[in-house]
Amino acid sequence: MSNNVVVLGTQWGDEGKGKVVDILTERAKYVIRYQGGHNAGHTLVINGEKTILHLIPSGILRENVKSIIAHGVVLSPEALIKEIHELEARGIPVRQRMLISEACPLLLSYHVAMDIAREKARGTNALGTTGRGIGPAYEDKVARRALRVSDLFNKESFAIKLKDIVDYYNFQLVHYYKVEAVSYQKILNDIMVVTDMLTSMVADISVLLYNAYQQGDIMMFEGAQGTLLDIDHGTYPYVTSSNTTAGCVTTGSGLGPHYIGYVLGIVKAYSTRVGAGPFPTELFDDTGNFLCLKGHEFGATTGRRRRTGWLDAVALRRAVHINSISGLCLTKLDVLDGLKEIKICSAYRMQDGCIIYTTPIALEKWEGIEPIYETLPGWNETTVGIQALADLPRAAHQYIKLIEELTRVPVDIISTGPDRRDTIILHDPFSD
């Protein structure tokens, strides 16, 4: 069995994956982003200094780690170059540490324009996208009209292909959505400025990863968003446009499933969601406000305030099953400090009174769901910075045990603060 590890979110994103990946990359040779785009926001805090990454893998801060953007990612050249310059200004040699798949679809300004136009046209039925163009970029990939990084090697051919697709988008933008057209010449000029930088980092990622496996190098696969936002398994249509589950690791990176050994599911000690969509355990009271403010629940990408609620073990069980999760990492446990009681949703009561223990599929069936809670005592002691399980309050132990019982999966890692050091590792994911 391989000891390569997948790290992914089990909720609606924002679970704290970036910090966990950063910790575990101390053991890895490669960190791979395999899906999503710059709609992700992974926050790392190292010695009190905050770093927010959107496209670049969280392993970039490690000197001996190679960061990979694989072909399952839709790549915004503008966002990537901006991120590279910001990190290099801090002395991090990004271009020496990172490689990009030449099969990555390019995300350009016409995708953003279409995303924004569609959301505006939906009015009160807006999906709550980040407006970064992710959906339209994936649409182009599926429709086989996407421009890819590999197209940049032939600038003349790229310019012709770009003209065709800009005309296609502008027809819709102007005649259907009644908004301004995007400028073909500006898009072409902007991409030509950064073409040489992008192509200098290109590699055949599938071959690279297979060779790394043959050499015994350890790999970490970093997911973006969360399971409940998966295009197939999430709360459709309030989902992202990629597969966020473990199955996408192989299709999005080009490394076969036999070479994956352990799947670590990141779960926040409470639930959050950005944008519209079902959220059975959402809190609208002082407790919800407490979790939002204490947990600093504002999007790293959009700055939007996140909706907050109690931990939903029903949805978490679904994530465990879909991803064949080996172990859980419980994050932001310290945010619960000071609450008199803590609740976990263990089942749903449907509108007809029926009790179910797994999430529904159809959107209509989410309506009117009543969460059924298990209530536990809270704790007044601080858990911030605790690094040993024995030092946690007794009530925190009870909370962790109930999560394990409801999901039938062990909690292998506990995060007690934003810094690397604020972590309890009960089981090493690389030891399997």
From Swiss-Prot:
Pathway the protein acts in: Purine metabolism; AMP biosynthesis via de novo pathway; AMP from IMP: step 1/2
Intracellular or extracellular location(s): Cytoplasm
Binding residue positions for IMP: 14-17, 39-42, 130, 144, 225, 240, 304
A single Gene Ontology CC term: cytoplasm
Cofactor: Mg(2+)
Broad enzyme group: ligase
Coiled coil: none
Keywords: Cytoplasm, GTP-binding, Ligase, Magnesium, Metal-binding, Nucleotide-binding, Purine biosynthesis
Catalytic activity: IMP + L-aspartate + GTP = N(6)-(1,2-dicarboxyethyl)-AMP + GDP + phosphate + 2 H(+)
Binding site residues for substrate: 300-306
GO MF annotations in UniProt: adenylosuccinate synthase activity; GTP binding; magnesium ion binding
Entries under CDD domains matching the protein: AdSS (cd03108)
Active-site residues from the entry: 14, 42
Residues bound to Mg(2+): 14, 41
Keyword hit for Transmembrane: no
Cystines in this chain: none
Binding annotation for GTP: 13-19, 41-43, 306, 332-334, 415-417
Assembly notes: Homodimer.
Name of this protein: Adenylosuccinate synthetase
Organism, scientific name: Baumannia cicadellinicola subsp. Homalodisca coagulata
